[in-house]
Design a protein with these regions (language model features):
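Nucleotide-state sensing region of NTPase/ATPase domains
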Residues: 47-133, 137-145, 149, 203-211, ...
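Conserved NTPase motor "head" modules and their coupling/switch loops across ABC/AAA+ ATPases, GTPases
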Residues: 1-31, 45, 57, 173-309, ...
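Long, charged N-terminal accessory/stalk domains
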Residues: 125-126, 132-181, 185-188
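Walker B catalytic acidic pair
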Residues: 313-315
Length: 365
């Protein structure tokens, strides 16, 4: 897959912009706080239907404007495609998606049309932070590649919220207790779908990340990933989740919240058998995240059947020369969008399009 054009209208600090990227590397350079990251954010919006920086879509609309639009055109094996995301402050529907000439009924229909992997300095939190950050990493990867997973995840969140609301209602009205069985069954059923997808994906990412990390470290360190779940090893995830919910019912009723399930999942990340979050140095943690992102890129290509785009947001300056060289070797294989303040960070990379960014204005150099 190759992005042939990206157009922005009233998006963040861009009045209007048209980008015709190189088939290889396209670089956006300039001082900080000029709008470089906003371009990658626009691409990410067309990949996943949401920003990687904020959950508030209205923040993406240019100040003083009622709406914003991002359009991406791509060339793929089966022809050319176009997707557009329109955000509005004033319309009843705040976000709409167009796929070609058709308006999508659901945001999830966007998934899979533009496949991309974003790597930013904030991704270090995948290793450093708690389980929620690693679940987010899993869910964003799988939602993009498997729309059915995205819809299952939406159902799981709704069902969990409804079960938690019922637990609070039961505290006030114990006669509602029998209705809990229905929600347990629904939560276990959709949870099993999530669990099985996560288990399989983490297994594949483990192999790919391990190989990438061995290459990055010259064979000196072994990175491993392991899916951590209350039912990770169960042959039947549905039955195991249902049993866990049954055993936890008294505690759930006492605390008025669901204490077991997929919302407690995690990925254990280890280097040479030691937990990377606790025992790895900052440099080792950066290497681990880079290996994860390279694995994510490989998995996305294998699952989608198309080479995904790679978005690098000011990460070159964060890497030492060895890691930078390893990453540059790999970006030659896919279409890559890079933001940086200094072009020397990309020494050795294949030359492509370069845009100078100043206060939301792009100049191709």
């Amino acid at each position: 897959m190759r992005v042939t054009s990206l157009s922005l209208s009233h998006f963040r600090n861009y009045e209007r912009a048209l980008i015709e990227p190189d088939a290889g590397v396209t670089v956006f350079t300039g001082p900080n706080a000029q709008g470089k990251t906003n371009i990658l954010e626009a691409l990410h919006l067309c990949c996943l239907g949401k920003s990687h920086r904020t959950s508030r879509d209205e923040e993406l609309i240019q100040w003083g404007r009622d709406s914003a639009r991002v359009t991406v055109k791509t060339a793929q094996r089966d022809g050319t495609h176009e997707v557009a995301v329109v955000l509005s402050r004033t319309q009843r529907k705040k976000k709409t998606v167009r796929i070609g000439l058709r308006q999508a009924e659901r945001i999830g229909e966007l998934l899979g049309h533009v496949c991309g992997v974003l790597f930013s300095p904030e991704d270090l939190q995948i290793v450093k932070d708690g389980p929620a950050e690693r679940r987010r990493f899993m869910d964003m990867q799988l939602s993009q590649l498997r729309p059915a997973y995205f819809y299952a995840l939406q159902r799981a969140v709704r069902t969990l919220n409804q079960r938690n609301a019922l637990l609070k209602d039961i505290a006030r009205n114990p006669s509602l207790l029998p209705t809990l069985d229905m929600w347990d069954e629904q939560l276990a059923r959709v949870g099993a779908v999530i669990c099985e997808n996560r288990r399989e994906a983490v297994g594949r990412l483990d192999e790919l990340a391990r190989a990438a990390h061995l290459s990055l470290t010259g064979g000196r360190e072994e990175l491993r990933l392991r899916y951590v779940s209350q039912v990770a090893d169960a042959p039947d995830a549905y039955e195991a989740l249902l049993a866990r919910l049954s055993r936890a019912r008294s505690e759930d009723l006492r605390r008025m919240t669901t204490t077991v399930g997929i919302h407690r999942d995690d990925i254990a990340i280890t280097i040479d058998g030691k937990e990377a979050r606790t025992f790895a140095s900052q440099g080792q943690q950066r290497s681990a995240v880079l290996s994860l992102k390279l694995a994510q890129l490989e998995l996305a290509g294998a699952e989608s059947g198309e080479a995904p785009i790679l978005m690098l947001d000011d990460v070159m300056s964060e890497l030492d020369p060895s890691r930078r060289r390893q990453l540059i070797e790999r970006i030659d294989r896919v279409q890559t969008f890079v933001t940086c303040t200094d072009l020397s960070d990309l020494a050795g990379a294949r030359q492509g399009a370069v845009y100078r960014v100043e206060n939301g204005v792009l100049t191709r150099t």
